[in-house]
């Protein structure tokens, strides 16, 4: 019987789902998006394990860890703050001369970044961690919500964490301000989220060791022509609607083989229409369609003007029900035609010539939180695990052709023994994160 497997890219563990997989996958993603900051026995044990291990060995970054079920082990900010106090003595700062005569303070030591609210924050911070312990990092974005949340999260864990780690949070107000901050604080790395035009201008004006850009793609879904299209449409609609209710709303892209594109599009419209669909310009709309890209900018301007019941609120307790969800926009060849929709959840349809072409498009999109691969090809798993830099991958595959166990070469057999064993194994190997 065909089933669906979820592969956790942190623990490399696989979870099998039954034929009711769309609902279970939806619940799994929802639990991550709306993760509570509650204290429980598992979280207390995890923090104690981190403290015990890091008391004996310094200079290590402990990554956030998920259980095999996909649900997060949640720890309170107070507990994490107590763990961070133990680590302060491990932080060392040394100045390094640059060729131009200036000096940069490189920071080494221990940083624990353990986001316990909302997967987009988790995804962002995971990308920040490799640079935090070695360089000053500037976070630049026109979207205040995501990066305000990161700063709030870091400040609540420990007010000194951002300073010690070298993280600088800045909203992308204008080129002059950004470059000024970089020069004043001697920033060596830049994580940028914005348009390609703005990125090109910024590259021209500043001198950084590295610039990592984000495209704004929340997650990508690949659909092959041999998929169960009806089941796929239900799952995509449920996942996207759950995701779009999060305060951190990002576009999603469905990459579908051309032969089944029209059918899948019609099925998606049918499924999303079941969720209180109405006129995109109506005050009572909760889900709407903007199928004509020519009208995208106009629709976005009206929605963001506040004339509709549109909310754009950062709220720790979850999301508001009364959020406008423009659900489906046919992708246009000219990206400028969709300008203005960057801050709204869009489900875009895009053709792919083949699975390999889909991989190429996914990799180029850059900012991924989930990738869902719908196909009956059993060989996709190995290929995608090497090709896609994402945190979770979902497969519609035949269980009989998959191996029973999948060991991560980094943690080996310890992966099945829980967070404590995983952290200790990571500490002993001294290579937690691959540097880019």
Where are these regions (language model features)?
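ALDH superfamily catalytic-core signature
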Residues: 53, 156-161, 184-185, 195-332, ...
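Structural signal for hydrophobic packing residues in well-ordered secondary-structure cores
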Residues: 33-40, 51-65, 69, 73, ...
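Residues at or immediately preceding the N-termini of alpha-helices
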Residues: 22, 40, 175, 229-230, ...
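Residue-level detector of anion-binding/catalytic polar loops
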Residues: 137, 312, 368
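Residue-level signal for inorganic ion chemistry
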Residues: 32, 65, 135, 168, ...
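N-terminal Rossmann-like NAD(P)+-binding subdomain of aldehyde/semialdehyde dehydrogenases
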Residues: 1-102, 123, 130, 274, ...
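Rossmann-like NAD(P) dinucleotide-binding subdomain of oxidoreductase/dehydrogenase enzymes
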Residues: 94-231, 403, 409
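Conserved C-terminal structural/oligomerization subdomain of aldehyde/semialdehyde dehydrogenase
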Residues: 8-20, 27, 31-34, 42-48, ...
